[in-house]
Regions:
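N-terminal short beta-loop-beta anion/metal-coordinating cradle
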Residues: 26-65
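A generic "cationic amphipathic patch" detector
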Residues: 58, 99, 108-110
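Short glycine-enriched loops at secondary-structure junctions
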Residues: 47-52, 72-75, 100-101
Length: 171
């Protein structure tokens, strides 16, 4: 399917984004001044880039509280440098991997995704390896296997991060 936008549609979309940003700045102006010069998040949050999954799902104020890293399937390896920056440079005391129900990337990794663009295939390949390592029951429904795969993916990402951050300990 080819997406065709008229110039006026693009201009309208950009103006809408600009207006929303200006309204946000006005609404949060005093709050933003508190951290304009430096960030000090309490958590590095790795989450899926699915447009339905948002950091505001569990906090009304993610600004300067979360160093957010997003990719398909909330994978550690795809953005390892970003995660390292949050944990080691910004010194966030928490690292959270946030999975979500009905993750399309996880579902794709469980099936045939060879018809997708090569850059997407490379990213899903990491998920597929993670899912294949998991012990997911084949005796349950496809929906239950998908749910279990989402959970197992989060667990796999946590295990990878634990290995890389083994030198860090709670004090």
């Amino acid at each position: 399917m080819e997406l065709v936008l008229k110039n006026e549609d693009v201009v309208s979309l950009l103006n809408s984004i600009k207006e929303a940003n200006l309204a946000y700045q006005e609404d949060k102006q005093s709050h933003i001044k508190d951290f304009a010069k430096a960030q000090s998040p309490m958590c590095t949050l790795v989450m899926c880039c699915d447009s339905r999954a948002h950091s505001t799902s569990f906090t009304y104020n993610p600004e300067n509280n979360f160093f957010i890293v997003r990719n398909i399937g909330n994978q550690y390896i795809l953005n390892q440098g970003c995660v390292e920056y949050g944990v080691r440079v910004l010194n966030t005391p928490l690292l959270i991997f946030l999975g979500h129900t009905a993750c399309g990337a996880v579902k794709a990794s469980m099936g045939n995704y060879g018809n997708l663009h090569s850059s997407i295939i490379r990213e899903i390949d990491h998920l597929a390896l993670s899912i294949q390592k998991s012990d997911i029951s084949t005796s349950c429904s496809a929906e239950e296997r998908w749910r279990d795969a989402v959970i197992n993916n989060v667990n796999q990402q946590v295990e990878l991060a634990i290995k890389d951050f083994a030198d860090l300990r709670l004090s």
